[in-house]
Design a protein with these regions (language model features):
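Charged, cofactor-coupling segments
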Residues: 29-145
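Active-site cores enriched in adjacent His and Asp/Glu residues with nearby glycine-rich loops
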Residues: 1-41, 64, 69
Length: 145
């Protein structure tokens, strides 16, 4: 689906075609209640400010993590037909994208996994007793009961 130098593709923002959203955000008592304070106050600080590049501008958490913070970790991959068509028509990122192959995924939709993470003194801890199945074996075992 992609070609060329990975670092150059990321620097150009090519990944935003597949993940035009942030990777996660702060959590309060509810999943999104911290957003009402304004992302600039919650997800950023005086040292770290938002970036205005498409895709990267959707990052909602850039501040230094501290013990006691609870954040979401939400990697995802989407194939948004209108966005694919727009980028292809404009010839965007053609040095990094293989549009003919991407076209075959337009009916896929997308998927996003989410974990809620507690930041501790020594690292982090995934909250909750069970993760969603993510490997092929885990998904098949879940489907087959």
């Amino acid at each position: 689906l992609m070609k060329g130098d990975v670092n150059a593709a990321v620097a150009a923002g090519t990944h935003a075609l597949f993940m035009p959203h942030g990777l996660g955000h702060m959590m309060g008592l509810d999943v999104h209640d911290m957003e009402d304070l304004g992302q600039i106050y919650v997800g950023y600080d005086d040292e770290t400010r938002p970036i205005d590049q498409f895709g990267t501008s959707s990052l909602r958490m850039g501040r230094k993590l501290q013990p006691g913070f609870v954040v979401t970790d939400e990697p995802g991959c989407y194939f948004i037909p209108a966005l694919i068509d727009q980028w292809k028509e404009q010839g965007l990122h053609k040095d990094f994208l293989v549009y003919d192959k991407i076209e075959t995924y337009k009916d896929f939709g997308g998927i996003r996994l989410e974990d809620d993470i507690l930041i501790t003194e020594n690292g982090c801890k995934c909250m909750g007793d069970h993760r969603a199945p993510i490997t092929v074996e885990e998904v098949e075992n879940t489907i087959n009961g």
